[in-house]
Amino acid sequence: MDKLIMESQLPKFTREPEKYSRLRLLEALQELYLSIEMLKEGYTRNSASKLFLSWKALMSSLVVSNFNKIIEKKKKEGKEDDIKWYLRIGYSAPTTGLMGIARDLEDLGFKGLVTLTTAMLGIHKYAYNGLDEDISPFHSRKDAIIALKELIKSEIDIVNVNSLDEEEKELLEKIKKEFDKL
């Protein structure tokens, strides 16, 4: 696993969309692997943080690989502001735009992304706030672990249906193997 992928400059998504999307997918896989490793070591909040970063990278990859379809749909709907937003920052799947992105991707045929994004935002809250009963969606460590495992599995399933290159396939197999140890 090339650890420098997550640390390197990404190409402009408008110039090299396929490369950008592939790098974000690889980043998603690397973060997912780290989430599993953190969970195995008992660091649930760190695992949650990595899982959320993985989800954002995966969503960015999906947006860029489906960018033309999203923009075409927005043009038909007359949503010029949405088009500008996707060109300016939406392609990167910012946290504040994840729900809208999930809806747009579901409109293209991706199933369950709104529900998963809602759950991932809960994981994000847990990563920052821990078991604070006034803020966190989880009130026990056990509940957080159950949710983390379910969401990791869901993300694995989503990645599994994508066409992957050899490096991505190898990393996904490694992820599945480590997940089975949880």
Which role does the model predict for each range below?
Residues 24, 50-51, 116, 144:
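Amphipathic alpha-helix face/heptad-repeat signature
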Residues 55-73:
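Short, charge-rich amphipathic alpha-helical segments embedded
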Residues 47-48, 54:
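Solenoid-repeat scaffolds in large eukaryotic assemblies
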Residues 68-182:
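Long, charged low-complexity segments
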Residues 1-44:
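Charged alpha-helical initiation segments
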Residues 40, 50, 71-72:
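Long amphipathic alpha-helical segments with strong coiled-coil/leucine-zipper propensity
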